[in-house]
Structure formats: C-alpha cells, structure tokens
UniProtKB/Swiss-Prot annotation:
Keyword tRNA-binding: yes
Keyword field: Ribonucleoprotein, Ribosomal protein, RNA-binding, rRNA-binding, tRNA-binding
Keyword RNA-binding: yes
Protein's name in the database: Small ribosomal subunit protein uS7
Reported function: One of the primary rRNA binding proteins, it binds directly to 16S rRNA where it nucleates assembly of the head domain of the 30S subunit. Is located at the subunit interface close to the decoding center, probably blocks exit of the E-site tRNA.
Biological process terms in GO annotation: translation
InterPro entries linked to this entry: Ribosomal_uS7, Ribosomal_uS7_bac/org-type, Ribosomal_uS7_CS, Ribosomal_uS7_dom, Ribosomal_uS7_dom_sf
Pfam families per UniProt: Ribosomal_S7
Amino acid sequence: MSRRSVTKKRVVPPDAVYNNRLLSMTIRRVMKSGKKSLAARIVYDALDIIKERTGSDPIEVFETAIRNLTPLVEVKARRVGGATYQVPMEVRQGRGTALALRWLIGYARQRSGKSMAIKLANELMDAANETGGAIKKREDTHRMAEANKAFAHYRY
C-alpha cells in the first residue's frame, strides 16, 4: 500500500449543452480513442431520441436511469485462511455512479441495432423503466451480496 498522501479527487466539469456533470461523465465513458466530439454527438443524439419518443425531459429520464442502475451493495473477494470469501460491501456514491455508467454503456454496446445513439437511448429508457440488461446486472449484484450475507463480518 502506498504511503503517499491521498490523491485529490478531480472535479468533473459539466457538459456544454445541458450543464450536467453526470452527462459529462457519460460522454467520457462513451468516448473511444480520444474522439470526444463523436462521443458527445452520440450522447446528445440519444437524448434527442429519448425526447422524441417519450415527450418528457431527457435529462430526467437519464438521471432516473442512473439512479435505478446505481448498486447499493457489491461483493469483494477476501482471502481468509486459504479460502476466498465473497464479502458483501456497501458501495460508495462515486463508485456506484461509475458502476452504473459502466454497465449502462457496456450493455448498450452489446445491443443489436443500427447506431450507438439508438442503442444508448433504448438502454436508458429501459433502465428508467427498470428493465434491460444493465438493470439485470444490478439485480445480480444485489442477489450475490444477499447470498453471501453470512460473510459480512469479514468486512475490512
């Protein structure tokens, strides 16, 4: 373990169009090979598709989706006397958001469809309605934590 001082958290600047930090984080996650303008176009197109289909505020749908995807508990491997236990741990807010974004974009990429904007929009709308692959991943994570509740006393 490092003996250096704790690193300072970087402040994520909000995005240019909606002035939203969470959206800026999403754009950075969608980005591949440093192509940020393309990633931004994909995310904004996805929000336009959501607005077109639902008729409601796309930022509200987006934030609801992220809130629904954020896990409360996860399991971490802990080695105790030759055996490895899956120990349930509470998820900190920053990590929970990061996991939610990772799952959202991962399952959007796996979807079959024409463009990434359409796939991302569909995954966001599904997550807001508590369906879809990313929600299933969150439920699996919670189920794993529940199944391994007996090892909660190994928390560190």
